[in-house]
């Protein structure tokens, strides 16, 4: 006889999820891509703080003022003394390279082992003289303006002649003429005082007056000239006195 066998089903077990095979390769690919970007990206150089080499070299040559030109050593020393803090450590190597470029570009001329500025790079002194002309033109109007200020000052003295009224003081000398007449008046009292003298003296005076009048006919003797007639009459006075003594 056949027996029935009952099969019991096996319990279901959850299968663990399989990890993707590409998972560990993904981060490695990202790292390689980042490195490639860094390699291709250009490095930014720090901008130099010093002046361009062309300017520094031309400044050194013009300041040194050497007839045969300045050597690379002299140029390097001058630039280092002036721009020492701003220069890179390999400055001398870069300077030699720049000197060769400047000679090739025609900005410098090499004579043996020295360098000179070419005629094209030398500064032209003519532009400096050009700005001087407007200065002189500006000064001329100033000189023209000065006489205008002086002319009113000159006109003021013309008004000053008003004190011409001062000549009134010149009229004062007329008053001294009056005292001249006073001495004549003083002389008259002397003649009045001579009246007590004898009549003989009066007759002598009259004769002397007549003789003086004859000597000067037609001329009227002024009052002042009467005084000398008295002096002429004095000898006549002495003559009668001598006769009286006899």
From Swiss-Prot:
**Residue numbers spanned by region Disordered:** 1-51, 105-246
Q: Does the keyword DNA-binding apply?
A: yes
Gene Ontology, cellular component aspect? nucleosome; nucleus
| Keyword Nucleus tagged | yes
Matching InterPro entries: H1/H5 (IPR005819), Histone_H1/H5_H15 (IPR005818), WH-like_DNA-bd_sf (IPR036388), WH_DNA-bd_sf (IPR036390)
Question: Where does it reside?
Answer: Nucleus; Chromosome
User: Could you list the residue ranges forming a coiled coil in this record?
Assistant: none
One annotated GO biological process: nucleosome assembly
Q: Residue spans with biased composition (Low complexity)?
A: 9-34, 224-235
**Pfam families xrefs:** Linker_histone
**In what ranges is there compositional bias, type Basic residues?**
35-47, 129-189, 198-208
Check the record and name the CDD domains matching this protein: H15
Keywords of the record, alphabetical order, are: Chromosome, DNA-binding, Nucleus
On the tree of life, the source organism's domain of life is Eukaryota
H15 domain ranges (all copies): 49-119
Any one Gene Ontology molecular-function term assigned to this protein's record: double-stranded DNA binding
The UniProt entry's sequence similarity note says:
Belongs to the histone H1/H5 family.
Q: What does this protein do?
A: Histones H1 are necessary for the condensation of nucleosome chains into higher-order structures.
Instruction: List the protein's name.
Output: Histone H1
């Amino acid at each position: 006889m056949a027996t029935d066998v009952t099969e019991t089903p096996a319990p279901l077990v959850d299968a663990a999820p399989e990890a993707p095979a590409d998972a560990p390769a993904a981060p490695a690919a990202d790292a390689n891509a980042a490195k490639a970007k860094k390699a291709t990206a250009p490095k930014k150089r720090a901008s130099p703080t010093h002046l361009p080499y062309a300017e520094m070299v031309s400044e050194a040559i013009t300041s040194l003022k050497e007839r045969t030109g300045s050597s690379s050593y002299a140029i390097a020393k001058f630039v280092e003394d002036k721009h020492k803090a701003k220069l890179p450590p390999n400055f001398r190597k870069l300077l030699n390279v720049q000197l060769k470029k400047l000679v090739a570009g025609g900005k410098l001329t090499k004579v043996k082992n020295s360098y000179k500025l070419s005629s094209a790079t030398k500064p032209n002194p003519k532009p400096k003289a050009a700005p001087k002309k407007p200065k002189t033109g500006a000064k001329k109007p100033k000189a023209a303006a000065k006489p205008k200020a002086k002319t009113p000052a000159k006109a003021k003295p013309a008004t000053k002649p008003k004190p011409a009224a001062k000549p009134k003081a010149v009229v004062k000398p007329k008053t001294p003429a009056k005292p001249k007449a006073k001495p004549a008046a003083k002389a008259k009292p002397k003649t009045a005082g001579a009246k007590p003298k004898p009549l003989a003296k009066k007759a002598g005076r009259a004769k002397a007056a007549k003789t003086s009048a004859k000597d000067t006919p037609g001329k009227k003797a002024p009052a002042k000239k009467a005084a000398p007639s008295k002096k002429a009459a004095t000898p006549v006075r002495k003559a009668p006195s001598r006769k009286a003594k006899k």
